[in-house]
Amino acid sequence: GLNFPNNAPGLYIAPFKNDLVVIMNTFKNMNEKIVVEDVPLNKWINVIIRVEDENVDVYINGSIVKRHVLDSVPKQNYDDVYMSMNGGFSGYSSNLWYYDYGLGTTAIQEIVDNGPDLKMIGEDFLGSKPRYFSLRWFFNNTDSNNQSYGGF
């Protein structure tokens, strides 16, 4: 389920689908939704959510896959930042960074180029699955306002 009341931003995996759902609180709309469809499973992916003024850009592995203009100014979340609430997901998180400014494309690419931190507490995690995914995925994400999620 959604965290309440603060989602500025909130990042969720859609139930029963491999879609990412970004939720932003604004002063006009409590939960503006941006859907990134058909995200590859069982692969490391880098997700960057950049908010500047009323514009939200979602990057996957350094490529912008969604651009969304909010209905109004986003609400700033002054509370704690939570990860993997309500049971989380069956996967791993590598790093979480929160900046007080919108990163430029060079900084975004540097983060992607550095890759995930594969060092787990007490052991190394080097998966045997390839770290790439089909370019076809990039061409199938065009609608940022998918309305098909009952709880989202």
Task: Kindly give the residue locations of the regions a language model identified.
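Extracellular glycan-associated modules
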Residues: 1-152
